[in-house]
Regions:
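Short alpha-helical interface elements
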Residues: 20, 41-45, 64, 75
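A short, structured beta-strand/loop element
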Residues: 27-61
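N-terminal first-folded block
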Residues: 1-31
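C-terminal structural segments of small proteins and small subunits
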Residues: 55-81
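Short, flexible active-site loop motifs that bind/organize anionic cofactors or intermediates
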Residues: 6, 49, 67
Length: 81
């Protein structure tokens, strides 16, 4: 897990979603008003709801959750960005 200072200030949501899709996540953007989306790891069917605006503080905790739940690290995600 990188330090907060090592993370980019803000990542575009579409770019982040594209990287997650390349890693094998399924993305569910249906329902609601569009302020959140759900990523699903097909191997375990576990899911995580993510806020659409990925500020640095939100990104840090999101990456922490992704690593704990799915075992996918920031270095793997950043390679796909």
């Amino acid at each position: 897990m990188p330090s907060r200072s090592a993370l980019p200030g803000e990542i575009k949501t579409r770019k982040f979603i594209r990287a997650l899709r390349r890693l094998g996540f399924a993305i569910d953007m249906s329902g609601g008003d569009g302020s959140h989306f759900k990523i699903i790891w097909p191997k375990t069917e576990k899911s995580l709801t993510i806020q659409s605006k990925l500020r640095k503080d939100v990104l840090y905790y999101t990456l922490k959750e992704i690593e704990e739940k799915f075992g996918v690290t920031w270095s793997q995600i950043s390679k796909e960005l």
